[in-house]
Amino acid sequence: MEESQQLKDAGLKITLPRIKVLQILEQSRNHHLSAEAVYKALLESGEDVGLATVYRVLTQFEAAGLVSRHNFEGGHSVFELSQGEHHDHLVCVKCGRVEEFVDEIIEQRQKAIAERAHFKMTDHALNIYGICPQCQ
């Protein structure tokens, strides 16, 4: 079972709630899920896992490096599996939809700006807020 190995590799004990939450994150077409969305998906699949447990598991996953937490406009947190590849986000301010993108020109400019300021960049995040085509 792949989920079990991922949990072991992250130093986490294998529990049914952890496996189920990890499966929801892996199977979701939407790569950015709130704790509430994970909870709803668990309920829809007939799993008896409480919302507090979902929050706790997601926090443990974040600490173990399995997921990244993003706090977008509006103050809600969403989680995505850590894929190891950097990307930035387009965020719809009306519906909350999040779209990932990679732009090498933007990446190069950010590095150049940091170097020009003699700043050792360790990480960065770019979130562009606007209105998606479906909400326009």
UniProtKB/Swiss-Prot annotation:
- The segments labelled DNA-binding in the record are 1-83
- Name the positions where Fe cation binds: 86, 88, 107, 124
Q: Which GO terms describe its biological process?
A: negative regulation of DNA-templated transcription; negative regulation of siderophore biosynthetic process
Q: Which PANTHER family match?
A: FERRIC UPTAKE REGULATION PROTEIN, ZINC UPTAKE REGULATION PROTEIN
The UniProt subunit note reads as follows: Homodimer.
Q: Where does Zn(2+) bind?
A: 32, 80, 89, 92, 95, 100
> Does the record's keyword annotation contain Metal-binding?
yes
GO MF annotation: an example: transcription cis-regulatory region binding
What is the organism field in this record?
Legionella pneumophila
Q: Which first-to-last residue range defines the signal peptide? A: none
Q: Among the entry's GO cellular component annotations, what is one?
A: cytosol
Q: Which Pfam families match?
A: FUR
Name of the molecule in the record: Ferric uptake regulation protein
**Similarity annotation:** Belongs to the Fur family.
Give the protein's biological function: Acts as a global negative controlling element, employing Fe(2+) as a cofactor to bind the operator of the repressed genes.
Q: Which domain of life is it from?
A: Bacteria
Mark the transmembrane ranges. Answer: none
Which residue intervals make up region (Dimerization)? 84-136
Q: Where in the cell is it found?
A: Cytoplasm
Q: Which InterPro entries match?
A: FUR (IPR002481), Fur_C (IPR043135), WH-like_DNA-bd_sf (IPR036388), WH_DNA-bd_sf (IPR036390)
> Sorted alphabetically, which keywords does the UniProt record give?
Cytoplasm, DNA-binding, Iron, Metal-binding, Repressor, Transcription, Transcription regulation, Zinc
